[in-house]
Amino acid sequence: MKSLRPASLCFLAVAFVLIASARAQAAAPTDRPIIALWPNGTPGSEARRTEPEKIVGSNVSNIHQPTLTVYLPAPARATGCAIIVVPGGGHARLAIEHEGYSVGQWLADQGIAAFVLKHRLAKDDATPAGTTQPYTIERDALADGQRAVRLVRSLAAEWAINPATVGMLGFSAGGEVVALTAMRAAPGDTTAADPIDRPSARPDFQALIYPGRSGQIIPEKGAPPVFLAAGYGDRTDISEGLAEVYLRFKRAGVPAELHIYAGAGHGFGLRESNKSPAGAWPTRLREWLVDRKFVPTK
């Protein structure tokens, strides 16, 4: 893998300056680069870009400057594959540890470049009661998901990433954002003034881990291949609904793999302490990536 070139270092430096507050940084690993999706300010969020994020335990909310936290693999292990990780949290907060940073580190250890997305929240728990939420899923969370895919592709050469193997992985509400980004696969604009807007926003694959709103996941022919996982004990729209999602992908002729774990419920994420079969879903995901040729066989 090539090291970061001066242009990339400059880009990162600008992004660091523009990320809102030291308090917000406290929740993120201190040794990881953090990149603002829009270094000059997020469209529609300009007036609130300097507000600090709200951090309660491992949950983050009050996000007005969407970012990617970067986990690059060791050069000797790099596969060229990249995954944007989208934590869940009911669109009110992001469960940034067990559905974000721990996943990013695991993927990097497997040779996969990972980027943990903090996106704008449609039901942000930092918004005062009785106040209209400033963001929506289909406008702002989607825009952040699309921008994240484009940003990673735009810097693929700098990070030795194959721009044809850039996927997304989402948990719960984050799975909704991933599925929506895949369904609203926006092409790039080769004439755009902003070079980040030139690549396609279509993820090459998607992994949906106990995603919500399963009834709204309607793939079309040519949709990105999908890896699905959930717990038998999850709520019905997920534990049963994900089986129907799998069938929709199959009927559309889109490669799909489904895992339902008998002993699991909702929100198992990635925890080192989870030694159950559900705790091994990341290994199953990596096997699927190899099988689909997004990750080379070692």
Residue spans of the language-model regions?
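Bacterial N-terminal signal peptides that target proteins for export
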Residues: 1-11
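Bacterial N-terminal signal peptides
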Residues: 10-19
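Serine-hydrolase catalytic machinery in alpha/beta-hydrolase-like enzymes
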Residues: 34-35, 41-60, 64-67, 74-83, ...
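Primarily recognizes the serine-hydrolase "nucleophile elbow" in alpha/beta-hydrolase
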Residues: 140-223
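Acidic beta-to-alpha connecting loop that harbors the catalytic carboxylate
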Residues: 232-235, 263-265
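Conserved alpha/beta-hydrolase "acid-adjacent" motif
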Residues: 235-241
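C-terminal catalytic histidine-bearing segment of alpha/beta-hydrolase fold enzymes
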Residues: 250-298
